């Protein structure tokens, strides 16, 4: 069972984000909130049942705390001296009539996707050369326990400098957090999100 967040609290947070967008401090923000989930599964059970492309289960032995995460998005891939990112932005239920045409024709979804692709391209430029958008706004089909959804993705790549292997931590630090889960511009939007949450 998922317990709904307090609507009044969420409305205040939304108003903080919205007023910053109206003032031009951000033009895309992902506002989230904590919710309580009552479940008879352990974190390990959830991890093993998750259908995400990427799943992680972290256990802190000192505090006995656990964290589980699953995501369909490939944030960063490094292969043969190249770095790739595959931002996802734009989703629709695949069972809806003409779902593909609706999603690909949606101006709001297209604008959000363009914003995040530009942000990730910019982030990759901090750590790589010859950054390019290799594939723009293609469809992925994601299979969930409630049915398929369509998601738009892009592929962005760049060439890492010689010796990058010694600096993987710095590369990830320059890229994190992923713009597709924060918003744009990233630093200011993160300040706004922190203020609202």
Task: Report residues per predicted region.
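Extended alpha-helical targeting/anchoring segments
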Residues: 1-197
């Amino acid at each position: 069972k998922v317990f709904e967040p307090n609507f009044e609290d969420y409305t205040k947070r939304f108003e903080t984000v919205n007023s910053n967008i109206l003032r031009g401090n951000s033009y895309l923000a992902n506002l989230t909130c904590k919710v309580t989930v009552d479940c008879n599964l352990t974190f390990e059970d959830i991890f093993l049942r998750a259908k995400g492309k990427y799943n992680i289960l972290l256990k802190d032995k000192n505090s006995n705390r656990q964290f589980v995460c699953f995501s369909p998005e490939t944030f960063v891939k490094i292969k043969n001296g190249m770095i790739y990112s595959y931002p996802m932005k734009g989703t629709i239920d695949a069972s809806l009539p003409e779902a593909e045409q609706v999603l690909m024709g949606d101006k709001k979804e297209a604008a959000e996707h363009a914003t995040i692709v530009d942000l990730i391209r910019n982030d990759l430029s901090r750590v790589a050369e010859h950054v390019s958008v290799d594939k723009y706004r293609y469809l992925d089909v994601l299979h969930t326990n409630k049915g398929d959804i369509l998601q738009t993705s892009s592929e962005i790549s760049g060439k890492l400098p010689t010796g990058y292997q010694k600096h993987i931590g710095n590369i990830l630090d320059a890229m994190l957090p992923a713009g597709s889960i924060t918003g744009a511009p990233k630093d200011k939007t993160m300040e706004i999100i922190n203020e609202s949450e």
